[in-house]
């Protein structure tokens, strides 16, 4: 783990996605953070020690999903399945719910972790990540802690490495190159996840805070807001946290009454033509009961 002394920084961004705005000054206290996302090898040690069964390994209870056909009540997870050609981005046609896809079988039955030991663990829910953190004597980061760490001392820069997207024409993280979702040119060498530390560290010596996998935080999702100044109170919030569990729900959206946590960092599926979220300020609302092949996590220790 690497210790960060904390401090005041400008959180958020303007000019990209509305859920990132406004830019606001916040303060975080000192904390330590994992140098990389938790790897398959590390997660395997946790499972061996505790017998933990992940969310994706448990068949859904039909009572929790009214109207679901019984034949679909099988364990599994969402796997990226690139289409042969262009598709409507709103269709999300590149995702397949694959029975038997788990952290140990990331592409479904017949796949293994051979050669992926030092890749980030995926197909883990928020509860799986929190269970690992508790076992390790750690915690999941807040959104503010994650963004502070991801910025690596570059105050106000668009990217974790500066304001130039690809310095010298070289990818600085594992993200999608080419037309998404059907034409990855593999300029960074990876179609899916990559081994941690495959790309240069940021200014704090941290790896993979941008790209590779989205990472769970422990904050409920909400749109940012600026607190009104109150007499006798400092105008810079300290250690801000997200919304309430209830407020994180998008009752009119596809996730319905399922609470949502904030994901940070972007992933190998973020593309300039589709999802420019390979930036410290980027954020995404992920239902806590949804697991995919591009979401992982890392841990912090506060104080």
Task: Enumerate the predicted regions with their spans.
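Short capping motifs at secondary-structure boundaries
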Residues: 31, 46-55, 136
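An anion-binding catalytic pocket shared by soluble metabolic enzymes
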Residues: 34
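Short, structured beta-strand segments at or near domain termini in extracellular proteins/domains
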Residues: 293-303
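A short N-terminal beta-strand-loop micro-motif at the entrance of redox/enzyme domains
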Residues: 25-31
């Amino acid at each position: 783990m690497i210790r960060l002394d904390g401090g005041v920084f400008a959180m958020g961004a303007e000019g990209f996605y509305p859920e990132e705005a406004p830019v606001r000054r916040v303060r975080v206290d000192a904390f330590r953070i994992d140098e990389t996302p938790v790897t398959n090898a590390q997660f395997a040690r946790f499972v061996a020690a505790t017998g933990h069964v992940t969310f994706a390994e448990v068949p859904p209870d039909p009572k929790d999903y009214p109207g679901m056909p019984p034949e679909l009540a099988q364990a599994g997870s969402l796997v990226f399945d690139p289409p042969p050609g262009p598709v409507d981005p709103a269709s999300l046609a590149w995702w397949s719910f694959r029975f038997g896809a788990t952290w140990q079988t990331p592409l479904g039955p017949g796949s293994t972790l051979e050669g992926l030991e030092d890749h980030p663990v995926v197909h883990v829910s928020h509860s799986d990540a929190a269970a690992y953190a508790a076992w390790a004597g750690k915690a999941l980061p807040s959104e503010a802690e994650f963004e502070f760490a991801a910025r690596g001392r570059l105050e106000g820069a668009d990217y974790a490495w500066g304001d130039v997207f690809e310095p010298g024409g070289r990818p600085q993280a594992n993200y999608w190159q080419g037309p998404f979702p059907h034409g990855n040119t593999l300029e960074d060498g990876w179609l899916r996840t990559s081994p941690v530390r495959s790309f240069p560290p940021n200014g704090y010596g941290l790896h993979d805070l941008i790209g590779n996998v989205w990472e769970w935080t422990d904050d409920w999702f909400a749109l940012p807001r600026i607190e009104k100044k109150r007499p006798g109170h400092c105008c810079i919030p300290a250690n801000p946290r997200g919304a309430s569990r209830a407020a994180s729900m998008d009752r009119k959206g596809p996730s319905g009454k399922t609470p949502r946590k904030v994901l940070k960092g972007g992933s190998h599926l973020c593309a300039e033509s589709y999802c420019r979220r390979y930036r410290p300020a980027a954020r995404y609302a992920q239902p806590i009961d949804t697991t995919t092949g591009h979401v992982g996590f890392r841990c912090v220790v506060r104080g």
